[in-house]
A protein has these predicted regions:
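Gly/Gly-Pro-rich "capping" loops immediately C-terminal to redox-active cysteine motifs
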Residues: 68, 72, 84-117, 134
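Sec-exported extracytoplasmic/periplasmic mature domains
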Residues: 76, 80, 123-127, 148-155
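Short, flexible loop/turn segments with low-complexity composition
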Residues: 159-169
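Periplasmic c-type cytochrome electron-transfer domains
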Residues: 2-69, 93, 113-117, 134-149, ...
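Sequence/structural segment immediately N-terminal to covalent heme-attachment motifs in c-type
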Residues: 65-88, 176-180
C-alpha cells in the first residue's frame, strides 16, 4: 500500500514541480542560457525520427544546372542570412540564435542528406528554433530547387558556386511567389511522400 501511495504522490509531485519550475522563471529561455539536460539530444532524436518517417522519397524535379541556379537565388534571398554562403563567416543573426543555425556550405551537414530530407526541413521548418517553414511562401518547385541545391552542395557546377556568392539578381525577386503565381502551391500540412 505504501508503494502505491508513493507512486501516486510521485505522479502528482513531479509534474507539479516541473510546472512551478517553468512558471517560476527558472527555465532557460534566453538564447544565451545553457541547455536543459538532454534537451539537444531529445530534440535531435525527435527531428530525425519524424523526418525519416515523413520525408518524400523522390524529388519531382531533376538536379539540373537551371534548378541549381534557381535554388541558389532563392537560398540567397531566404536562407543565407542564417545559414551562410560558401566561404563566408557566420552572420550576426546566426551568431545570436539558439540553437545556432548550421552553416550549410561548410563541408558537412546537408550534403549527406537525401533531397527529401532537405525538402522536409524547408517545407516544415522547426519549432522554437527560428527556422521557418516555407510551405506558405514558396511553391513546390521552389522548395525542391533549394533542396536539390543543398543536397548537392559539395558537387555544384562552377556557375552555381559563382551565383551563390554574387549579389542577388532581379531573378530572385521574379522567383518569389509574391511576384509570380506559383505553379504548384504547397498547401498540404505535410509534404507529399
Amino acid at each position: 500500500m505504501k508503494f502505491v501511495a508513493g507512486l501516486v504522490l510521485g505522479l502528482i509531485l513531479v509534474p507539479a514541480a516541473l510546472y512551478f519550475y517553468l512558471i517560476g522563471g527558472s527555465a532557460p529561455v534566453a538564447t544565451t542560457d545553457p541547455d536543459i539536460p538532454f534537451e539537444s539530444y531529445l530534440a535531435r532524436k525527435a527531428q530525425h525520427v519524424r523526418i525519416d518517417r515523413d520525408m518524400p522519397k523522390t524529388a519531382p524535379i531533376q538536379p539540373t544546372e537551371a534548378n541549381y541556379l534557381a535554388g541558389a537565388e532563392l537560398y540567397k534571398q531566404h536562407c543565407a542570412v542564417c545559414h551562410g554562403l560558401p566561404d563566408s563567416k557566420k552572420t550576426a543573426i546566426a551568431t545570436g540564435m539558439y540553437p545556432r543555425p548550421p552553416q550549410l556550405f561548410m563541408g558537412k551537414g546537408v550534403t549527406d542528406d537525401e533531397p527529401g530530407e532537405s525538402y522536409w526541413k524547408i517545407f516544415n521548418g522547426f519549432r522554437l528554433t527560428g527556422m521557418p517553414g516555407f510551405s506558405k511562401s514558396l511553391n513546390e518547385t521552389q522548395m525542391w530547387q533549394m533542396a536539390l541545391l543543398l543536397a548537392n552542395a559539395d558537387k555544384l557546377p562552377a556557375s552555381v558556386k559563382a551565383a551563390l556568392v554574387a549579389p542577388p539578381t532581379a531573378t530572385a525577386s521574379a522567383a518569389s511567389p509574391a511576384a509570380s503565381a506559383p505553379a504548384a502551391p504547397a498547401t498540404a500540412a505535410q509534404p507529399p511522400r
